[in-house]
Structures are given as C-alpha cells and as structure tokens.
Amino acid sequence: MSNAPDPRPRPPAVKTLDHTVAAVPLLQGRVLLHEHAQHTPRPRPALDDSLSGVVMTGANADARAFQLRADVGYQGTLLIDSAVYTTYTATAEEPFMAPPDELFAAVDTSLNFQKARGATAALTPTGYIPPANSRALKGVMREANRIERADTLVSLPIDVTWLSRENIGQLIAVCDKIRHPKAVILFRQFDPLGQTKDIPANLRRLFTEVEYMSLLRTDLAALDVMAHGALCAGIGVQSSLRHAIPPDEKAQVGKRGGGPTYPHILMPQLMCFKGAEFLSKVYGNSDPATCDCEECDGRSLDRFYLSDGETRREAENHNIHTWGAWVSDMASYRAGSERKTWWRNKCAAAVDRYALENQRIGVGASPKSGFQVPAPLKAWATLPATQ
C-alpha cells in the first residue's frame, strides 16, 4: 500500500458560522442575487461583495451552495433557500416542512445543515401561507418564537393578498410578534405588486412599521423596500425567481405555444424588465436603446434575442451591473428621508422617459407596440417619500 500523497487537489474547507453569530449585522443593507440551483454555480464578478451576496434557490440549493463555497471559492454573503414553499403549504399545526412529531428538532437540524453547507444565516423551511389563513400565519409565529438562535431568518412565503387593505393590519401585528428577522416572499402569477393599487403602499407600510424585515425572490421592489428600511432583499437572476406561485398552481407564461425562452433585460432608463423578444420587435424599425454598463459598454439592448447560454449569461451580467449600480447609489444617501427622496425622484424620472422613448421610436404606449409604465413603478414615483 503506497503512502505517497494524493496528487489531486482538495477543495478548501468551508468555513461555518456558529448559530450564536447574529444574522442582522451580516445581512444589513445588502441586495442579494437569487441564483437557481438547477445550474452549476460559477463566479459572478458583477456582484459587489460589500453590498450584495447570493441566495441559492431551489430543491438542490444546499448542494449547489456547498459547490459555490468549496469549488468556486465564493467567500461572500450566502443564503440557502430550498424553496419548500413551492411544494408544501403551511398549516397551523405544521407551519414548517418537517415530521409533526419532530417539528422543533427537525427545524433546528435544517438550520444547522444550511450553516454546514456554507450559509451566512439560516432560513426556516416555512410552507406557503395561503390567503387570509390566520391560523397558519400564527402557527409560523408560534414555532418561530421557539427557535433559540441568533442566526435565523423566519421565512414568510405569503400570498400577495396578505398585503390587501383587509389583511395588512393582521400581517403587521403577527410579524411584529416574531422575535427573529423576517424574510417575505410574495406569491402570485406574474408581478405580485401589479395586482392592485394597495399592494406597493402596504408593502412599504409593513417594512416601515416592523423592524428587521427582508424581501426575497423579487424584482426592483427590492430597492423600494431597501429605501424604506429593509434589512436586506433579493432579486432573482431570472423571471421565475422574481416571484413565487402557490404549490397547487402551474406557472402561467405570457408566451403561448412553447418554443425557446429568452432572457428578460433590465432597461436602465425605464427601470423595468422587458423580454428580449419584445425588445427585438419594438426596436425593429428604429435605433435601439443602448447601455453603458461594464458588460454592455455602449452596445444595444436588443442584442439578447438568442436562446444560447452565453447570451443568457451576458444578459444576467448586464442586469446585475445595472441594479447593482443603483444599490451602490442608494448606499451613498443617508437612510431615511434623504434615501427615500432619492428613490422617489429616480422612479419619477424613469416614468417620464416612457413617453419620450415611445415618441423617439414612433410607437404608442400599448402592450404590443410600445412601452407601458409598470404599475409598481408608477406607485413608487408618486407615493409620498415620507410613507
């Protein structure tokens, strides 16, 4: 038997944080990137490690997170979201996905396992909380308050109707009684914040009235809550990771008939995500919008109408550079009214550009021929900055 050393390089040991290391200071002020666990992790140079991080999301998230740490060598902020809420619905008796006779022990094991796989903080395995199901919501509160750890975020995967006029008061009251930091995930087909006019304002109210709230698996709503006092937030790398849908529903898509899928592109001047296919068509007879981010370097934004992996990665890098620059800008303003005013003015300026862009390319503001202002953006531009 040979005693010669093994010539194969060993992956570096993954550093783990004890459960007594508090989550709040490690996550404060960060806008994280939701990566999909179906893909092999890779470096993301576009991410600013001082203001961002990664949420590995999906059924294989723990293994992919470990790969990201051990194989890729990622040392930044990392959360593991196994997304149990996509298959499991919370009940009053079993709000977390675990055997009922082992609920507390199983939850603690889940949290420990996340930390062992390299997570900076741990997310509870909370099931989807259906509309107006007060007993399930209170069940989450009851079991969450049994957790004796400093490193835990209580995941709140709620139907967006919890932010309605009828339900927001109860949601705020229950969240206020959960003694750990909270991480909200909104459920609805397409954009949850576009459902009713009350939703953007009531989401702000939740984040203003309850301390240490986070909004994960979202879009530019991440920046709105950050401007209004959120602990942290997370933006999806692809459209399916910018919201969630209930376990008993299939994802609805705007495109019929199947076929290849194309990336969604963050428009820097208009502050919205638009599909590459739409951009290719809307700019078919005019000069396309361009971008000066590090990835684009002045190139046009209609170039992503391809379904290959390289084009998708380029589109993702553009998106990260774009919203990452806004996060950096926001951090330069003092938290409170100064930051809120900056954000409101930025959104208002973007709203004003829609008519100018439609006029420039000679189209009307219809879904088929031109750009329409998204309802949430319009709300962010008009709601009082003090709210």
Ranges and model annotations:
Residues 183-229:
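Loop-centered beta-sheet repeat module
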Residues 290-387:
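C-terminal extensions of enzymes
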Residues 226-283:
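Short helix/strand-capping turn motifs
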Residues 167-202, 243-253:
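Short, flexible helix-coil linker/hinge segments at the edges of structured domains or between repeats
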Residues 2, 53-61, 121-122, 217-222, ...:
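Glycine-rich phosphate-binding active-site loops on the catalytic face of alpha/beta enzymes
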Residues 66-68, 134-136, 196, 226-228, ...:
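Short secondary-structure transition/capping segments
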Residues 264-308:
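A conserved mid-domain beta-alpha-beta active-site/ligand-binding segment of alpha/beta enzyme cores
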